[in-house]
Design a protein with these regions (language model features):
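Short gly/ser/thr-rich secondary-structure transition/capping motifs
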Residues: 12, 56-62, 116, 136-138, ...
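Bacterial carbohydrate/catabolite-sensing allosteric modules
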Residues: 1-12, 56, 97-102, 126, ...
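Conserved hydrophobic packing residues within short motifs/helices of P-loop NTPase cores
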Residues: 77-79, 107, 134, 156, ...
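Amphipathic helical "hinge" segments at domain boundaries
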Residues: 44, 48, 59-132, 210-214, ...
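N-terminal helix-turn-helix DNA-binding module of bacterial transcription factors
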Residues: 1-74, 364-369
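Short beta-strand segments enriched in small/hydrophobic residues
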Residues: 24, 29-34, 68-84, 94, ...
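Short beta->alpha connector loops
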Residues: 112-115, 136-141, 261
């Protein structure tokens, strides 16, 4: 709520009391208190009237007092892997927007893929009395998981977590999106398809690689060992991995990357070696960050929606925090993935459809080489 900008310049925040709010809203002080503390039994129309009055008089609820009354801080912790990958700031924005509209503040931290830093962040969030923490890092060591679950307060993990009452898990269906990507490339005529993984110490990276191998096997397509290259989810790693693939005696005709940052690095490496995308090699990413649609060419990618993840994470935390939440007994949330086809994939070079497309492009005066 934007109460701060409504405070008259000659009045200190403390000078506006809960009594002023009650008087303006025409309700009792107890009703204001229940509305401020998001007690679910308060009539929604009445709660809206209270919050309107709060804005009008410029009242700032005392968060410490709220915590004493409700037994909760109304703060959620959110831990992400890093902030240099645009996927995570997009996820943070979606999570915070949802949490704030539902009456929660958010404390945010990034681990830079360090288990020690993750543990330190959790400890600091506990010191701030957060009601629960979403660990959205897509990979966390088992010994650290055990330390965290012993805290016995609501936790949300991605992909896997212990089967305990305070743990809720967001299970991403990596397989469906990657299967769609492989089938899309195979339908175009690609047979030599390579895969650049993420760091294989991460469970999510292993899941994506295994989904790729399974999808290729389902189509009877062979994957030479040299067509699987371990990356690190960065643009620099994408450049290095793509250079490794272009150095092969037989270049794959398509490459699927473990995330969009890797794919952007791969595009850069191909540009430097004058390999045209998609005329000479097709590239597919994973995540569908906002930047993907503005690449040249626009990146075909597997979408893992930040909004879906954030919505599930906030709902899962609230289910663990609020005893009367309608999904309090639920322990798993499933996150879909799907292929978004743009312009970084095409028929393999030298095939009849590619030759026809090339000829048509030349007739239109389009540079296709």
């Amino acid at each position: 709520m934007s109460a701060l900008r409504n405070i008259p310049p000659n009045r200190r925040p403390g000078a506006v009391s809960i009594r002023d709010v009650a008087r303006r809203a025409g309700v009792s002080i107890a009703t204001v208190s229940r509305a401020v503390n998001r007690i679910p039994t308060v009539d929604p129309a009445l709660a809206e009237r209270v919050w309107r009055a709060i804005n009008e008089v410029g009242y700032l609820p005392n968060t410490q007092a709220r915590a004493l009354v409700s037994g909760r801080s109304h703060m959620l912790g959110l831990i992400v892997s890093e902030i240099t990958n645009p996927f995570f700031p997009e996820l943070v924005q979606e999570f915070e927007n949802l949490a704030v509209t539902q009456g929660y503040e958010v404390l945010i931290g990034s681990t830079n893929y360090s288990s020690e830093r993750t543990e330190s962040l959790i400890r600091r969030m506990l010191q701030r009395n957060v009601d629960g923490v979403a660990v959205m890092t897509f990979g966390i060591e088992e010994d650290l998981v055990q330390k965290l679950v012993e805290r016995e307060f609501p936790l949300v993990f991605v992909d896997a977590g212990p089967d305990l009452p305070n743990i809720r898990v967001l299970k991403v269906n990596y397989g469906e999106g990657i299967r769609q990507a492989v089938q899309h490339l195979a339908a175009l005529g690609h047979r030599g398809i390579a895969f650049i993984t993420g760091p294989l110490r991460l469970r999510s990276a292993v899941s994506r690689r295994d989904a790729f191998l399974k999808s290729m096997a389902e189509l009877g397509l062979i994957v030479p060992a040299e067509h699987i290259v371990e990356g690190d989810h960065t643009m620099e790693g994408g450049i290095t991995s793509m250079e490794q693939l272009t150095a092969l005696a037989e270049l794959p005709t398509a490459v699927i990357c473990s995330n969009d940052m890797t794919a952007i690095g791969a595009l850069h490496a191909l540009y430097r070696t004058t390999q045209n995308v998609p005329q000479e090699i097709s590239v597919v990413g994973f995540d569908d960050i906002h930047l993907a649609q503005f690449m040249l060419p626009p990146l075909t990618t597997v979408q893992m929606s930040c909004k879906d993840l954030a919505t599930a994470a906030v709902e899962a935390l609230r289910a663990g925090i609020e005893r009367d939440h309608p999904k309090a007994a639920k322990t798993e949330w499933h996150i879909p993935t799907r292929l978004v086809v743009r312009q970084s994939t095409a028929f393999p070079r030298g095939t009849l459809p590619a030759l026809i497309e090339r000829a048509a492009g030349k007739r239109r005066g389009v540079g296709v080489d």
